[in-house]
Amino acid sequence: PKFNREQILRNLEESKLARESSKFKQYAAKEYALAEEIRYKNYWNEPILKIPKGSRPDPKTYVNSEYLTKHFAEFDEGATVIQTEWAYTNYSEANGFVGVPDDNTLFVMPTKYADKVIKNSNGNINYIEEKLGFPKGYFKYGGGLVRIDVEDLSDLDLRLPSGNETGANSMWIPGGETSGGVPEAILNTVPLDKTRVSRIGIK
């Protein structure tokens, strides 16, 4: 068969434009989703933080199921909490469990993020404080840091914090992230024999 060179070139150009258009649409959709996430986070923060602790709404009233699914997937490899040696000895070890019994809660981050935070700190304890949403100096006189990993979360009711928890400090923000940008959630209190405890070589 006889082919028209100009027609072939035109077809190739149209195919290229179609591919570029498809990529742009994917890029635009991704950017829009990110902008929406940022917009909603800004929407959450201001009004919710004005509500006194103890009266803040359940996160399920302002976070959709898609967001929750994506957020909880971060914890597929387990959850981790970092405490001072003092807090571990006087509370967790003394009680035989980690968490706050008053409201049956424990703030945690994904284990994979704990690995990153510790590595990126380069031994700087202030960096860990900042990333985990603690005031500067919070860990300074605690005698070192203890890492507690929880692998099996199946019976621990993984959920977003509302900001009403006993452990929610003045730097808490809505949406499941620390003020330092690390994903967080809460579990029920965890027996120490269901955890793995190790020391972090930072003081």
Language model: regions and residue ranges:
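Catalytic toxin/effector domains delivered as secreted proteins or via bacterial secretion systems
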Residues: 3-20, 38-203
